[in-house]
């Protein structure tokens, strides 16, 4: 039986700007199928005896540990891996390299995708090496993170790639791979640096768009801000006739310092695709915050308001990957809101609101308010405020984002709860 093992050295940069050796990830490859195990570094365990766990499958003790259930890889490392867009780009890059080197393209495995993300822009604060004395992977000093001024060219490159994967030059493939994020699905995107050295994610128009997705994401993003929800800085720029580019500042960085991010999928021990269909619920997020949150009262209120807001804008893609947590010195906090888009035909959320119902219904949201330690009186007032804010501002914000009256009428059903 053909078998070989890859040893990956794992570091974290969330306790200080200097990386700390976290442990060793072992990848066993048997006939093209990979299995994973991980072992914490003994010194890291000693210095982190009272530290929050990073993954429910990785308890704070010595010895090898393995993913549980149907999971092939630990969620901690899945969050550091590229999304579908990133995988498409890496697969294309491998074909280009194979052609240049006169060989057949390799089939890329999960560990190849994990190590293929650029360290400089990798999501969160987990980092990887194949040699303890070597560079953090992936390293690419020849292709630095593109500046803000390259956005127009990057949008054009993303459009070329969507239209013809085989026609894009390697240098642009490398630039588009830069996001290094497990967030965002297959949407074309790139990471860019602003003039102050801050990382931003640029989400470009896609040939598959039926509406101006970037503009509508900006509308809902600004509505969330007006509702008092925690959202990162954002902006909207039009570079072409194909739609708007939505830019959002990365919340996993504070200057040069990395902030560890974990998806709710990881922290709740879920697998990709977990949804209301299998009983995945907001109540599980509530339980996690109560048990592990550094600021549970604040985060429970924020989470509940997000549920109402998701209903108010019909954000039906609110699955476990689209909720997350960031790790600070005092523990886990609900991350800023991200990936919120209105859906005109939406009538159910991706997650159950209570144990078994995902219906967009204010009564359902009010039903679980006590679990979030919010009184019925306060919940009713907060919900009314969210709905009024959406009702009074969605048209105005849509117009400011360049969306026509017909585009607004098309999207109007997404705001039905607020307009009732």
Regions flagged by a language model, labelled:
Residues 1-320, 324-420:
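Phosphate/dinucleotide-binding and metal-coordinating scaffold of catalytic cores
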């Amino acid at each position: 039986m053909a078998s070989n093992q890859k040893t990956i050295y794992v570091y974290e940069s969330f306790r200080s700007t200097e990386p700390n050796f976290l442990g060793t990830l072992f990848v066993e490859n048997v006939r093209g199928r990979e299995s994973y195990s991980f072992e914490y570094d003994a010194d890291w365990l000693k210095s982190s005896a009272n530290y929050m766990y990073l993954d429910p499958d990785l308890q704070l003790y010595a010895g090898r540990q393995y993913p549980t259930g149907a999971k092939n890889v630990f969620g901690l490392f899945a969050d550091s891996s590229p999304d579908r867009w990133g995988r498409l780009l890496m697969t294309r890059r491998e074909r280009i390299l194979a052609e240049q080197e006169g060989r057949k393209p390799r089939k890329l495995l999960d560990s190849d995708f994990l190590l293929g993300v650029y360290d400089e822009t990798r999501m969160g604060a987990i980092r990887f090496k194949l040699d303890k004395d070597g560079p953090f992977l992936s390293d690419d000093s020849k292709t630095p993170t593109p500046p803000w001024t390259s956005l127009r060219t990057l949008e054009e490159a993303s459009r070329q790639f969507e239209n013809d994967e085989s026609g894009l030059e390697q240098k642009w493939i490398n630039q588009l791979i830069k996001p290094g994020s497990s967030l965002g699905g297959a949407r074309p995107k790139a990471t860019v640096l602003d003039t102050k050295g801050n990382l931003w994610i640029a989400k470009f128009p896609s040939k598959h768009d039926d509406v101006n997705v970037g503009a509508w994401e900006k509308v809902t993003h600004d509505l969330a801000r007006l509702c008092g929800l925690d959202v990162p800085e954002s902006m909207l720029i039009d570079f072409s006739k194909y739609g708007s580019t939505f830019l959002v500042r990365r919340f996993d960085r504070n200057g040069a310092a990395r902030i560890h991010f974990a998806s709710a999928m990881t922290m709740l021990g879920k697998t990709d695709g977990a949804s209301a269909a299998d009983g995945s619920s907001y109540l599980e997020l509530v339980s996690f915050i109560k048990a592990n949150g550094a600021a549970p009262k604040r985060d429970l209120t924020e989470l509940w308001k997000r549920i109402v807001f998701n209903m108010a804008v019909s954000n039906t893609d609110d699955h476990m990957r689209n909720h997350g947590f960031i790790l600070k010195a005092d523990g886990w906090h609900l991350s800023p809101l991200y990936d919120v888009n209105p859906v005109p035909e939406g009538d159910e959320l991706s997650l159950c609101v209570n144990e078994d119902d995902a219906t967009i219904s204010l009564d359902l949201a009010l039903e679980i308010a006590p679990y979030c330690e919010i009184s019925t009186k306060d919940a009713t007032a907060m919900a009314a405020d969210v709905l009024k804010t959406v009702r009074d501002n969605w048209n105005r914000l849509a117009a400011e984002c360049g969306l026509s009256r017909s585009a607004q009428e098309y999207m109007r059903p997404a705001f039905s709860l607020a307009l009732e």
